[in-house]
UniProtKB/Swiss-Prot annotation:
Span list, region Binding to RBR1: 143-153
The record's free-text note on cofactor binding: Divalent metal cations, possibly Mg(2+) or Mn(2+).
Name listed for the protein in its UniProt record: Replication-associated protein
GO cellular component, one term: host cell nucleus
Residues the entry annotates as binding ATP: 220-227
Subunit structure: Homooligomer. Interacts with the replication enhancer protein (REn). Interacts with host retinoblastoma-related protein 1 (RBR1), and may thereby induce the transcription of host replicative enzymes even if the cell is not dividing anymore. Interacts with host PCNA. Interacts with host SCE1 protein.
Organism: Indian cassava mosaic virus
Length: 351
């Protein structure tokens, strides 16, 4: 008769099951971390599970830095801190640490230490496994959680297509900015010039977009209330200092745009923004072109003087043709004073 087979497991990942183990997850982790092995542990995950008869079990995944050869069946035994009791586990080498991690995650009562190490078996299983991985990512609720899931369950796609995956998740999980709340109601602006009021009622029409609306350029000194008035007319895009038409900032459902303190010499898409055409594209610096629904007017706010005034910009000799076009597609107003009376307005917004 052949001698009994000697116990030996040589693996990088270990799956341990402790039946009828009364230790807490924290107590078990503390003891496991004190095991002396020639290769260091990189990740430990513990799940406490109650069986139907009420007996507690512990499931443990240990990932080592390199392969560890275990020849002692009692090496992973745990000891009760309150009574003379040892807890001996069933010991297995984990061929797929991702599968073991998913298994012990199922009950939710888990504790972890270290950083999970991705294994090459994570994405095995063909198209259905890939679909499951991407479904889990979409259901995760955030870009960061989705990336963690794909890094573990679809490592090949994660490494090969990270740029595209990251860009797509930005679009999927980008939350629209909260609606702007103007501290001053529109009725508090009691010195609005008639021409400005007429422009508002003729061109800002909500979702029912006018056919080729006219934009408006409002030039005036600082603290005249032009920014606050412009932002009190309805849902809008507010772009200050520079033009950012990325989905994180620009909302295609806005009623109008407000462009504040942007040097006209560096205003990209001058005609498209002034003229209000529908459906045009803009190239973003680090992403794919974005589709702009258009068909809405724009309020341009500026101060007098070079590098700010649109009038002075259009009066430059080289811009004579652009000026002729702009005068047909926009109204130009110079403010003579504040758009409100009294001191109840308080400080006005400054870009």
């Amino acid at each position: 008769m052949s001698p009994p087979k000697r116990f030996q497991i040589n693996a990088k990942n270990y799956f341990l099951t402790y039946p009828r183990c009364s230790l807490t997850k924290e107590e078990a982790l503390s003891q496991i971390r004190n095991f002396q092995t020639p290769t260091n542990p990189k990740f430990i995950k513990i799940c406490r599970e109650l069986h139907e008869n009420g007996e507690p079990h512990l499931h443990v995944l240990i990932q080592f830095e390199g392969k560890y050869k275990c020849q002692n069946q009692r090496f992973f035994d745990l000891v009760s801190p309150t009574r003379s009791a040892h807890f001996h586990p069933n010991i297995q080498g984990a061929k797929s640490s991702s599968d073991v991690k998913s298994y012990i995650d199922k009950d939710g009562d888990t504790w972890r230490w270290g950083t999970f190490q991705i294994d090459g078996r994570s994405a095995r299983g063909g198209q259905q496994s890939a679909n499951d991985a991407y479904a889990a990512a979409l259901n995760s609720g955030s870009k960061s959680e989705a990336l963690k899931i794909l890094r573990e369950l679809a490592p090949r796609d994660y490494l090969r297509d990270f740029h595209h995956i990251s860009s797509n998740l930005d679009r999927i999980f980008t939350k629209p900015p909260p609606p702007y709340e103007n501290p001053f109601p529109l009725s508090s602006f009691d010195r609005v010039p008639e021409e400005l009021d007429e422009w508002f009622h003729e061109n800002v029409m909500g979702r029912a977009r006018p056919l080729r609306p006219k934009s408006i350029v409002i030039e005036g000194d600082s603290r005249t209330g032009k920014t606050m008035w412009s932002r009190a007319l309805g849902p809008h895009n507010y772009l200050c200092g520079h033009l950012d038409l990325s989905p994180k900032v620009y909302n295609n459902d806005a009623w109008y745009n407000v462009i504040d303190d942007v040097d006209p010499h560096y205003l990209k898409h001058f005609k498209r923004i002034h003229g209000g055409p529908e459906d045009w594209q803009s190239n973003t610096k680090y992403g794919k072109p974005v589709q702009i629904k258009g068909g809405i007017p724009t309020i341009f706010l500026c101060n007098p003087g070079p590098n700010s005034s649109y009038k002075e910009f259009l009066d430059e000799e080289k811009n004579s043709a652009l000026k002729a076009w702009a005068l047909k597609n926009a109204t130009f107003i110079s403010l003579e004073g504040p758009l409100y009376s009294g001191t109840n307005q308080g400080p006005t917004q400054s870009c």
